[in-house]
Amino acid sequence: MPGATAVGITYAGGVILASEKRIAYGNFLVSKNTRKTFQITPYVGAACAGLVADMQILSLQISALAKIRKMDLKRDIPPNSVAKMMSNMMYERRFFPLLTQVIVGGVVGEPAIYTLDSLGSVLPDEYAAVGTGAEMALGVLDPQFKSGMSEKDAVDLAVRGIRSAALRDSFSGDGLDILALDANGAREIAQAA
């Protein structure tokens, strides 16, 4: 599976999803500006690691399903429902899996994140990292995460985690995409490379 690093962090009132921008296959650097963080609904997003085509099709299909579900229910779809829809789609393809790991996060009520593997296992947590740089990122997140931290602290922690991974993982690097989700919706946070 191609490498990448993505992290998700809950904070007081919201969720930060972040990913780096590099795509590399073996020794070949394919792109330095690839989006691996996606807005699924106005209040839910996903950060992915793995094959970019699989990330893109999964996020587009789940976004469409979430819009249909919202019209049916006449209310916003919470992150756990988006994660479950994604899990079902990934499990249906278990014999020809989508080669991606995903962190789904958002705020409809309380902030929440869920980690999914390529077969659709759903694991809730307060913070997570996926991809080939996950071990290095978790080495930063584990000792420094504090429940109820501020948005600024969560963004800083996400940046430190991904930068730590990029130092040791040749499949990660070339800048960051950061998506903040709170009760007001999703917004991108500008970040220097």
UniProtKB/Swiss-Prot annotation:
InterPro entries in alphabetical order: Ntn_hydrolases_N, Pept_T1A_Psome_bsu_arc, Pept_T1A_subB, Proteasome_bsu_CS, Proteasome_sua/b, Proteasome_suB-type
Active site residues according to the UniProt entry: T5
SUPFAM superfamilies: N-terminal nucleophile aminohydrolases (Ntn hydrolases)
Record propeptide residues: 1-4
Primary localisation category: cytoplasm
GO terms, biological process: proteasomal protein catabolic process
Protein activity control: The formation of the proteasomal ATPase PAN-20S proteasome complex, via the docking of the C-termini of PAN into the intersubunit pockets in the alpha-rings, triggers opening of the gate for substrate entry. Interconversion between the open-gate and close-gate conformations leads to a dynamic regulation of the 20S proteasome proteolysis activity.
Subcellular location: Cytoplasm
Lineage: superkingdom: Archaea
Annotated function: Component of the proteasome core, a large protease complex with broad specificity involved in protein degradation.
HAMAP family in the cross-refs: Proteasome_B_A
Subunit note: The 20S proteasome core is composed of 14 alpha and 14 beta subunits that assemble into four stacked heptameric rings, resulting in a barrel-shaped structure. The two inner rings, each composed of seven catalytic beta subunits, are sandwiched by two outer rings, each composed of seven alpha subunits. The catalytic chamber with the active sites is on the inside of the barrel. Has a gated structure, the ends of the cylinder being occluded by the N-termini of the alpha-subunits. Is capped at one or both ends by the proteasome regulatory ATPase, PAN.
Record-given protein name: Proteasome subunit beta 1
Lineage: Archaea, Nitrososphaerota, Candidatus Cenarchaeales, Candidatus Cenarchaeaceae, Candidatus Cenarchaeum
